[in-house]
Amino acid sequence: MVLAKINNKFFNYYIFICLVTSIFFLYHKFQFPTDWTTSEWLINYQGGFTRRGLGGEINIFLTKFFAISLRDAILTIQLVIFILYLILLFFYIKDLKLNIFQIFALFSPLFLLYPIAELEALGRKELLIFLFYICTLFFCEKKFKPIIVNLFIFIFFPIVCLIWEQIIL
């Protein structure tokens, strides 16, 4: 099977279009006060310890620290997570040699286009799992010492678990 490198110019445009349309849809999604993905980020520890309350506590802290609205804090957190995810994914994939099936999988609506194709998936906490995974791959690929990779995993994995509890199931 022939392996090919992705055309960087096309891939750059593709990632940029995914990024811009995701930001556009995420911003417009926040205009509706009944969106449940916003309330998912509001769960906090004020009513007692819950496994997924750290995200809400971080948003409340950002609201008080920067004197912004809670909706703006949630939108900012979601945008930062999504932008970091796409940037790290771009740097991880751009130099890989892929076969035709992997290229089709990469450009399918089930991978990079999924948050755009299914707006309910845009801005959800599951993106933290993907971001954590791609960060771990990034550290492993860049030939960091195993102690640094292990420290990254042991520090950030519990934080991700306290934000999104399904990861521990």
Q: Where are each of the predicted segments found?
A:
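Aromatic- and kink-enriched transmembrane "portal" helix at the membrane-lumen/periplasm boundary
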Residues: 53, 103-131, 162
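Transmembrane-helix motifs of polytopic, lipid-linked glycan transferases
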Residues: 76-100, 135-139
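Membrane-interface transmembrane helices that cradle and orient dolichyl/undecaprenyl
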Residues: 133-149
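Transmembrane-helix signature of polytopic, membrane-embedded enzymes
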Residues: 90-112, 145
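Short hydrophobic/aromatic helix or loop-helix immediately within or flanking a transmembrane segment
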Residues: 46-80
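Membrane-interface alpha helices of multi-pass inner-membrane proteins
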Residues: 148-169
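Start-transfer (signal-anchor) and selected internal transmembrane alpha helices
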Residues: 1-22, 97-101
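Extracytoplasmic catalytic/substrate-binding loops of multi-pass membrane glycan-assembly enzymes
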Residues: 23-39, 46-58, 164
